């Protein structure tokens, strides 16, 4: 499967989350299968992060959504463990503060979006 086409949001396009399958599972049904795939691709992730940083033109925002204890922290640790932590940031968002609630919905996210060559995980 070509994941870059399935999950990529093209700049300027409109996203309809009701059309996204939130229960998507790939052929790797077991935890052990998934860990094997992660290990296989860790070096490539590391190399691609370095190239993106060196190019300095693009950034990557990864949005993980799930309830408490859904495995978001484990996903970050396993999948992004090969990346250079100096080029990554992880931000969790809880209930908006009074200041955040006084602004538009996306105001609190803008400050945490990644700069060129950087990776951010929400």
Residue ranges and their predicted role:
Residues 1-122:
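Glycine-rich phosphate-binding loop of ATP-dependent small-molecule kinases
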């Amino acid at each position: 499967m070509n994941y870059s086409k399935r999950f990529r949001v093209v700049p300027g396009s409109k996203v309809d989350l009701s059309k996204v399958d939130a229960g998507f599972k790939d052929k790797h049904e077991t935890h052990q299968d998934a860990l094997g795939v992660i290990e296989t691709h860790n070096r490539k992730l590391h190399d691609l992060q370095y190239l993106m940083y060196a190019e300095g033109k693009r950034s990557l925002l990864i949005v993980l959504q799930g309830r408490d204890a859904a495995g978001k922290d484990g996903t970050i640790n396993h999948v992004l463990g090969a990346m250079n932590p100096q080029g990554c940031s992880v931000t969790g968002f809880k209930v908006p503060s009074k200041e955040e609630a006084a602004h538009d919905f996306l105001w609190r996210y803008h400050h945490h979006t990644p700069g060129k060559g950087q990776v951010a995980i929400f």
